[in-house]
Swiss-Prot record:
This is DNA mismatch repair protein MutS. Pfam families: MutS_I (PF01624), MutS_II (PF05188), MutS_III (PF05192), MutS_IV (PF05190), MutS_V (PF00488). One of its GO terms (molecular function) is ATP-dependent DNA damage sensor activity. SUPFAM superfamilies: DNA repair protein MutS, domain I (SSF55271), DNA repair protein MutS, domain II (SSF53150), DNA repair protein MutS, domain III (SSF48334), P-loop containing nucleoside triphosphate hydrolases (SSF52540).
C-alpha cells in the first residue's frame, strides 16, 4: 500500500527533525503521528487515536487545538523535549493539490521564550562547548535569546573549568562537540539537568567567518579562533531553531575566567547563593536577602553579579562608592526606586521584537518604560560617584522612539494583530477613511434595525453579525406571524428564531466586510512597519536596558544595606581580612530579630592563615565559616556587608568542603566525594583563595581521617605555592596541637556553657581549642531516649579508660610493621590485627607505658615537656628515645600522639 499524499509530506518533513516532536498543522489543530503521537499522548495525557495513512495499520495520532498550543508546548519543553512547529505556508483556498507545509520554528528548552514558562527573574541560557584536544583548550559560548545576552570565553580543557561555568550559568540546554571525552560528557550529564545535544566538528568549524560576520558584523573579527568556533555553533543552532537571524543578539561579550571570582559547583550549593539546598528555591538564599530590585532586568543582573563576583579592586570600589552615595541620601534613592518601579522588562520586549512576535501591547509597555527614563536621568543628574555619573551620561532618553509609539499605537490595542484596532486615529489617512466608512456602515445597520422594527411592529427584531453567516435580521418564532410576506430571505433556522437577509443588507454587508478586511490588513502592515522601525534602534535600546538594570542593582543594594544594617567594607589586596561583629545575612533573617550572635574574624597570610575551629555539632561552626565566605563575596559584588566594621582582602576563588553525600550515579561513596572535593581544592586554590573545610576525614576510620586532616593542614600551610586562607572545622581535637607546630595555624572554638549537665550553645567564636565534643549532650538535645543517653555515657567512660591501651597497641603494631617493611613487602591497613615479632626490650618499654598511662590524667601537662625534637634521632637510638618519654606528664591521648610521631619518624628512617 502507498502512503497518502499528506502522509508522504509528513514523512518528508519529519526526516529533517528526527529529534523533535513534530506539531503538524491540519486546519485548526496540530496533529502528531506515530511515535510522536505516542510520546505526546503519554506526556500530555491526550487521547491516542488513529488515522488512515495508506499503510496496512492506521497511524497512531493525537492532536491539540492550535490556539491552545502554548501550554502544551511548554509542558513538553519543560520535560526536555524539542518541538518542531510545522505550519501551512500557503492559503488552502489557492493551493493546487496538497497545501504546502514547512517547519517555521523549533522550540527547545534553551530557546523557549514564552513568558508563561520562562521565569522573569532568571535567564534562560543555552551553551555550546568546543574543545581542541591537541592544544588542550576549550571554549564556551552562552546566550539567552530572550534578552540578547551573548557571552564567550576560553580556557584550559579541564573538567573543573567546564563544570564551574555550567554551574555558574545553569543553562537549560548544552550543545557539545561529539568528540568530547566520554568521561567529561558523563560528568556534565551528572552535573546538570540541561538537555544535551551533540554535534559533529563541522557544525563548529565550517563557515564560521561567514556566519559570525552575518550576525555580529566586524565585531567578530577580533575574536580568538577557539571562541569563533563555539560561537559559530551557537549562532547556527539559533538559526536552525528560530529560522531567522535575531537582531537583539548583536554583540559578543568576551570574558576571561580570571575576570571574576571562581566558585565551583560544590561551593555555590554549600553557600546557597541563589537557591537553598533543601528545596532548590530562592527563599533562604543570599539572593533572597539581597533582591529587592524594582525591575526584572535588575533582578537578573543582580543574580549574575552574585554568580560572578569581581576580583578587580577598582571595579569593586566603583560599585561600593555608588551604593554609598545612594545609601547616604535616602530621599534620592526612594525617588529612584519609585521611578524604576514602572519600567517593564525592556530586554525581553526587545527579544520579542527581534523574534517577530511582539504585539501592540508589548510596544505600549516599551513606550511606558521609555517614558520613565527622563525622570530617572533627572534623579541621578547631580550624583558625584563615578559610576552614577557614567550612567547619567550614557543613558539615552530615546525620545524619538517614544514619540513614534505615542502617536501611532492605541493605548489599549487588540491582542491579536490581524484583528485591527491597533493604530491611533490621525496616524494614517487611509486608515481614517476606512474607519469612517466602517462607522457609517454601522450607523446604517443601526438605522436599518430601527426601520424594520417600526415597519414590522416586532420590537424584539435585531440586526446581528457573526463571522460565519455575516449580517442577518433575527426574529423570534413567537413573532413569525408578524413577518411581512416576501420582505425577507431566509438565511438560518435556530431553535427559537429565524434569521433573514435582504438584498439591501447583503449589499451593505459586502461594503462593510470589505472595508473591515482592508482596514485590518492595513493596520497590520503599518504595525509591522512601526515594529521594524523600533527594531532598527535595538542597539540603543539594549544599551539603555543594561544601564537601567545596573542602576536598579546599585539602588537595590543601597536599600538592602539600610534595611539590614549593613556597612560599607574597606578593600585591600594585602591578604588580610578583618571582620568585626560579622553576621550571616540569611540566618539572621530567618531567626527572631536580635538573636543572632555576631563574631569577629581575622584571617591573613601570616599568623592567622589557617583557623582550626573546634566545638560540638549544632554550635555554629559551619554557619560561621559560611558567614566569612558570604561577607567576602558580598563585598566583591559591590554590596555593603553585615558587620560593624570590615576590611576585606580580595580573593580570587572560594572553595568549600562542607557536607557530602553519596554520588550513586557516579559510583562514588560519601568519603570518595569528600576526597575528590579536597583534591580539587588542593590542586586549584592559590594564596589569594578562601577555603572552607568542614570535618575533613570524617567519612573513614578515626585514625585514617585524623591522618588525612593533619596532612591536609600541613600541605596548605607549608606548600609555598598554596598557603591559602583557610577555615578548618573539625572534631579531631588532636589537631589543636598544630598551633605552634605549624606557622599560620591558630585555634578557635565555639563557646559552650554547661548548666546542670546540660549544654547551652553560646554561638561565640573564641580563641583556643575546644576540649571536648559534647556529642552525647547534642544527642540528648536531639531527643534521643534517656536510656540510650545513659548507656552512651557508660560506654564513653569505658572507652576513655581503654583508649590509651588500645591506641598504644595500635602504635606498637605500626612500629613493628615499619621494621618488617625493611625486610619484606608493605603492611596491611593499620587497624588490621597481625602477628609481629618484637624484641623483648621493646615489649617491656611499651608495656610499662601502657600500665602507667591510665593514671596519667592526674598529672598536670606542661607544653614544654611534651615537645620532642626528632631531627637527630636515628635508627640506633629510636628505642632509647621512646623509653625516655615522660609518661607521667602525658594523658592517654597525648601518649597516642607521641607514639604516632615516633612511628612516622621510624618509617622516614627506613
Amino acid at each position: 500500500m502507498a502512503l497518502t499524499p499528506m502522509m508522504r509530506q509528513y514523512f518528508e518533513i519529519k526526516e529533517n527533525y528526527k529529534d523533535c516532536i513534530l506539531f503538524f498543522r491540519l486546519g485548526d489543530f496540530y496533529e502528531m503521528f506515530f511515535e510522536d503521537a505516542e510520546t505526546a499522548a503519554r506526556e500530555l495525557e491526550l487521547v491516542l487515536t488513529g488515522r488512515d495513512c495508506g499503510l496496512e495499520k492506521r497511524a497512531p495520532m493525537c492532536g491539540i487545538p492550535f490556539h491552545a498550543s502554548n501550554s502544551y508546548i511548554g509542558r513538553l519543553v519543560a520535560k526536555g523535549y524539542k518541538v518542531a512547529i510545522c505550519e501551512q505556508v500557503e492559503d488552502p483556498k489557492v493551493a493546487k493539490g496538497i497545501v504546502k507545509r514547512d517547519v517555521i520554528k523549533v522550540i527547545t528548552p534553551g530557546t523557549y521564550t514564552d513568558s508563561s514558562f520562562v521565569e522573569e527573574t532568571k535567564n534562560n541560557y543555552i551553551m555550546t562547548i568546543y574543545s581542541d584536544l591537541e592544544r588542550n583548550r576549550c571554549s564556551l559560548a552562552i546566550t539567552d535569546i530572550s534578552t540578547g545576552d551573548f557571552l564567550a570565553t576560553e580556557g584550559e580543557l579541564e573538567k573543573g573549568v567546564i563544570l564551574d561555568e555550567i554551574s555558574k550559568f545553569n543553562p537549560k540546554e548544552i550543545i557539545l562537540l561529539d568528540s568530547l571525552d566520554q568521561e567529561l560528557i558523563k560528568d556534565i550529564t551528572l552535573t546538570t539537568p540541561a538537555l544535551i545535544s551533540r554535534k559533529p566538528i563541522e557544525y563548529f568549524e565550517e563557515k564560521f567567518e561567514e556566519v559570525l560576520n552575518s550576525q555580529f558584523g566586524e565585531k567578530s573579527n577580533s575574536l580568538s579562533l577557539m571562541i569563533k568556533k563555539s560561537s559559530n555553533a551557537l549562532v547556527k543552532y539559533i538559526l536552525d531553531t528560530q529560522k531567522i537571524s535575531l537582531t537583539n543578539i548583536n554583540d559578543i561579550e568576551v570574558y576571561s575566567l580570571v575576570d571574576f571570582m571562581t566558585i565551583d559547583l560544590s561551593s555555590r550549593r554549600n553557600l546557597e547563593l541563589t537557591e537553598n539546598l533543601r528545596e532548590k528555591s530562592k527563599k533562604g538564599s543570599l539572593l533572597w536577602v539581597l533582591d529587592k530590585t524594582e525591575t526584572s532586568m535588575g533582578s537578573r543582573m543582580l543574580r549574575r553579579w552574585i554568580e560572578e563576583p569581581l576580583v578587580n579592586k577598582e571595579k569593586i570600589t566603583l560599585r561600593l562608592n555608588a551604593v554609598e552615595e545612594l545609601f547616604n541620601d535616602l530621599s534620592l534613592n526612594d525617588s529612584l526606586k519609585e521611578a524604576l518601579h514602572d519600567i517593564y522588562d525592556i530586554e525581553r520586549i526587545l527579544g520579542k521584537i527581534s523574534n517577530k512576535n511582539a504585539n501592540a501591547k508589548d510596544l505600549i509597555a516599551l513606550k511606558t518604560s521609555i517614558g520613565k527614563i527622563p525622570n530617572v536621568k533627572g534623579i541621578i543628574e547631580n550624583c558625584t560617584s563615578s559610576l552614577l555619573k557614567n550612567y547619567h551620561h550614557n543613558l539615552d532618553d530615546l525620545r524619538d522612539i517614544y514619540e513614534l509609539l505615542e502617536k501611532s499605537i492605541k493605548e489599549d490595542p487588540s491582542l491579536t494583530l490581524k484583528d485591527g484596532d491597533l493604530i491611533k486615529d490621525g496616524f494614517n489617512g487611509e486608515i481614517d477613511e476606512l474607519r469612517l466608512a466602517k462607522t457609517n456602515g454601522k450607523d446604517w445597520i443601526s438605522s436599518l434595525e430601527n426601520r424594520e422594527r417600526e415597519f414590522t411592529g416586532i420590537k424584539s427584531l435585531k440586526v446581528g453579525f457573526n463571522k460565519v453567516f455575516g449580517y442577518y435580521i433575527e426574529i423570534s418564532k413567537a413573532n413569525y406571524s408578524s413577518i411581512p410576506e416576501g420582505r425577507y430571505i431566509r438565511k438560518q433556522t435556530l431553535a427559537n428564531a429565524e434569521r433573514f437577509i435582504t438584498p439591501e443588507l447583503k449589499e451593505i454587508e459586502e461594503k462593510l466586510l470589505g472595508a473591515s478586511e482592508k482596514l485590518c490588513s492595513l493596520e497590520y502592515d503599518i504595525f509591522l512597519d512601526i515594529r521594524n522601525e523600533v527594531e532598527n534602534h535595538i542597539d540603543r535600546l539594549k544599551t539603555t536596558a543594561k544601564i537601567i538594570a545596573e542602576l536598579d542593582c546599585i539602588s537595590n543594594l543601597a536599600f538592602v544595606a539600610l534595611e539590614n544594617d549593613f556597612i560599607k567594607p574597606e578593600i585591600n589586596e594585602d591578604g588580610e581580612t578583618k571582620i568585626e561583629n560579622g553576621r550571616h545575612p540569611v540566618v539572621e533573617k530567618v531567626i527572631p530579630k536580635g538573636e543572632f550572635i555576631p563574631n569577629d574574624t581575622i584571617i591573613n597570610k601570616d599568623d592567622n592563615q589557617l583557623l582550626i575551629i573546634t566545638g560540638p555539632n549544632m554550635a555554629g561552626k559551619s554557619t560561621y565559616m559560611r558567614q566569612v565566605a558570604i561577607i567576602t563575596l558580598m563585598c566583591q559584588i559591590g554590596s555593603f556587608v553585615p558587620a560593624s566594621k570590615a576590611n576585606i582582602s580580595v580573593v580570587d576563588k572560594i572553595f568549600t568542603r562542607i557536607g557530602a553525600s553519596d554520588d550513586l550515579a557516579g559510583g562514588k561513596s560519601t568519603f570518595m566525594v569528600e576526597m575528590w572535593e579536597v583534591s580539587n581544592i588542593l590542586k586549584n586554590a592559590t594564596e589569594n583563595s578562601l577555603v572552607l573545610l568542614d570535618e575533613v576525614g570524617r567519612g573513614t576510620s578515626t585514625y585514617d581521617g585524623l591522618s588525612i586532616a593533619w596532612s591536609v593542614i600541613e600541605y596548605i600551610c607549608k606548600n609555598k605555592n598554596l598557603r591559602c586562607k583557610t577555615l578548618f572545622a573539625t572534631h579531631y581535637h588532636e589537631l589543636t596541637k598544630l598551633e605552634g607546630e605549624i606557622h599560620g595555624v591558630r585555634n578557635y572554638s565555639v563557646a559552650v556553657k554547661e548548666v546542670d549537665n546540660n549544654i547551652i550553645f553560646l554561638r561565640k567564636i573564641i580563641e583556643g581549642g575546644a576540649d571536648q565534643s559534647y556529642g552525647i549532650e547534642v544527642a540528648k538535645l536531639a531527643g534521643i531516649p534517656d536510656e540510650v543517653i545513659n548507656r552512651a555515657k557508660e560506654i564513653l567512660e569505658t572507652l576513655e579508660m581503654e583508649s590509651s591501651k588500645d591506641n598504644l597497641d595500635l602504635a606498637l603494631k605500626e612500629v613493628n610493621a615499619s621494621k618488617e617493611e625493611m625486610k619484606e613487602a608493605s603492611i596491611e591497613a593499620s587497624y588490621e590485627v597481625k602477628e609481629t615479632i618484637v624484641e623483648e626490650d621493646k615489649i617491656e618499654i611499651i608495656e610499662e607505658i601502657i600500665s602507667k598511662s591510665s593514671d596519667a590524667k592526674t598529672h598536670k601537662k606542661e607544653d614544654d615537656q611534651i615537645q620532642l625534637d626528632f631531627s637527630a634521632i636515628g635508627k640506633d637510638n629510636l628505642i632509647k628515645e621512646l623509653s625516655e618519654v615522660d609518661i607521667l606528664s602525658l594523658n592517654p591521648m597525648e601518649a597516642m600522639n607521641r607514639l604516632y610521631a615516633l612511628v612516622k619518624e621510624a618509617k622516614n628512617l627506613i
